[in-house]
Amino acid sequence: MSEIMISKEAMQYIHMAGNLLKIDILDCIVSNDRLVFIVRKGQLGIAIGSKGKNLEKLRNLFKKNIKFVESDSDTKRFIHNLCKPYSVKDISVDGEGSGAVVKIQVDPSDKSKLIGRGGSNIEIIRQLAQRHHSVKDVQIK
């Protein structure tokens, strides 16, 4: 697992969201139109809030789409969490240590959505997998 370097902008988002929702936010990826927060295991329900009210609060505050992902010490479960809400059929980890390659098999109807426009979704998944686990690359099958 590599050392996590968080930008000043991401730190501000983490601080504001964490204080507002009273949860532990471990990481944040800032994209053009969205924020992806990694929350401590067991705090996903609190982060989203009843009927998604906390998501809506943050959307209004930051004027960006918000996604929460639950952290997990198991690489496969963490990758599965990153891929939600898409239908993941299988996740395999080839290799060990910092050279591990994760291969995700998804339902064909979800493949393009998981990759995202211009590869934006898969790039975020790669970044977070590398930051939180010893993963070299993430591939979609």
Write out the residue ranges for each language-model feature.
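RNA-contacting regions in translation and RNA-metabolism proteins
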Residues: M1-K141
